[in-house]
Every structure is written in C-alpha cells, then in structure tokens.
Amino acid sequence: MQVAATDIDQVFAHTTNLASCNLNSKILACSNDYFASADNLLTPTPSISRPGVFVHTGAWYDGWETRRHNPDPYDWAVIKLGVAAAYIHGVEVDTAHFIGNYGEKAELQATHAPEGSGVTDAQIADPSFAGWKTLLPASPCGPSQRHGWKFDAEISQTPYTHFRLLMYPDGGFARLRLYGHAIPPPAPAIQAASAPVEELSSALNGGVALAASDEHFTPSSNILLPGRGKDMGDGWETARSRAAGHVDWAIVKLGLSGSVSKVVIDTKDFRGNFPRAVRVHGLVAGAGGDGVPSADDANWVEIVKGDKRCQADTEHIFGPDDLTAGGEDTRVFSHVKLTLVPDGGVKRFRIFGRRA
C-alpha cells in the first residue's frame, strides 16, 4: 500500500529505520555508482543539496547516482542489515534533490540468510543470486520527493537480513529507509540465573522510542543507537523550556523485556545544553496495557533513585547501589521512561539487565 509523503513519519512512527549506517547496515555491492556512492543511501540524516559544487565526475549529489545509458533494465544495490534479522513493515525511497536525474522506478527484494545459514555475503552480492523475494514490485518514482509503501502482514511478519534495491533504468536515489523492528539474537541455552547481562534497550535488540515530549532539534530514537556517536547531531535534544517545573521525557519499549542491573545515560558532546538532572522509571510487563503508555501513567515505577545530577560530556553509570531496588531489580520491565530535568540533550540511554 502506498503511503503519502506527508504521512510517512506518522505511519512508521513506532518503527526503526534499519537501513542506516548508524545501525551498522552496509552496502555489499552495487551495479554502478559512478556519480555518487551507494553508501549514501544509508546515511541517517536527510539528504542535502550543494548547488554549483562539482567534483571530478560532475555535480556533487548526496545520494546514489549511476552513469547514464544503462544497457541493462535496471541498476541495483545490495544491502546487509546491521542487526541479526528484522521484520520490515515498510520502505521509503527518497529522491530528494534528484530532479533531472532521478530513477524512474524502484523495486525492493529481500532474503533471509542469517549467520550460520550457509549462504555467504559474497553469494548474496553476486548478480546471479537467485534467492531474492520481491517485496515491492517496480513502482513509479518522481523527482525530489519521498515515496513510501507499507507492507502487508505476510511480508511484515517474515524475517529478512539482506535487501536488493533496483532502480529503473538508471539515475539517482537519495535515501533508502527500511522501517521495522530488529529481531534480537536468540537467547543462550543456559539457566536463567546464569543468563548474561544484555543491553535490553538497544535498537540492535529491537528497542524502539515510542514517544517523546519534544524533539525540536533531534529525534529521541537516537538515544538507542549503538556506540557513543560522532557529534551532538546523533543524540536527542529538546527545545529550551521557559515554564517553571518543566520536564521533558522519552518513552522506550525495550527490545528485550527483563530485569535491570545497570542504567547508562551519556551526555557526550552535550556541553552547554545537558540536562540538570535525569530520572528513570519503568513499566513492569503487562502493567501498561497495549499501545503507547502515557507519560503520566500511574503504573510507572522508579528504577533509579530520585533525580540524578548530570555533567557535561559524561557517561553517567548508575549501578546496583543507585537502583531503587538496592541491587538488580528482578522485576520484568517492558518499557522505560527517561525524564530530563528540565530539558536539554543526551546522547545515549542504555538499560542493561537479563532478558526474561
């Protein structure tokens, strides 16, 4: 089902763009990228334009652009997800700033070849690979605009690891976005008491930012990304508040429900705009009902004791002694809420514990 450009963000609000280099996704191969690298398809930020800027091959473009006069029906690029596998609910092909040189049609194919399947990346990247399933048949694209499609239940409930984007007949696409949820790696076959501590909130494990009070500068989904990032642009920053008693908040659905043994809140790169303090609450599995929990739901319980003061450009680690439970909180949490007092920015929000 096609999704209007103005509705894409709303329709896929509770998903993650898994076709992002921030989530370790990468281009395995492409038919051609003479004018602009296929790697640009996976850039997490919107495409930019630099009119009048030329490089050796011609005009500079922030996207994937192939040479003219393709002798084949289409150009192609093969993408490997950075997560173990994922359920994909929809796709977006963005032709931003490609006007006289955009690809006229887009097609998306996928396959499931997890680690240990016996199918290698080299085999999948080969043009002769026959294991592709078409998720989106060749569909028209227009100049400098977002194009979205939502998949049916059969597709969105099937796991995939690799994708192939076809561009008819040649030209340029700015971005590819694959909206869905990461599937966590399977749990080790050991006793629960010996279960390893994992990052329950990570986008790599299926964590999703469901809602936030404010995302004026950057989205709350950034706080679930792996690593510490490169600059302030890949964290979450809210607008300045003026009202007394104001707080900002973000609600996260854990990719892995479980106990909590450690919380990390990182203000890396936030130096004049970090929050004065933070609070961390959780919802015990089943307590919040279906859908997106309200920020003022009475079922939120304190995970970290009280308000914790923050510092600039610092990774704040709250261990067992900082937890309200006085040690590992063995309740099974499904959601967590990070509150900024009164506002500001954080780079990462990490919940560590043992999956249920």
Where are these regions (language model features)?
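Juxtadomain low-complexity/linker regions and immediately adjacent membrane-anchoring helices
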Residues: 1-71, 89, 97-128, 144, ...
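Short beta-strands within extracellular/lumenal beta-sheet-rich domains
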Residues: 70-83, 237-256
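N-terminal low-complexity, intrinsically disordered tails enriched in Ser/Pro/Gly
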Residues: 76-80, 85, 92-98, 111
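Beta-strand secondary-structure signal
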Residues: 78, 90, 164, 251, ...
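Helix-boundary capping/turn motifs
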Residues: 80-86, 228-231, 253-258, 328
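Beta-rich interaction modules in large eukaryotic scaffold/regulatory proteins
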Residues: 117-151, 291-324
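C-terminal, well-structured subdomains that either form a transmembrane helix-short loop-helix hairpin
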Residues: 249-269
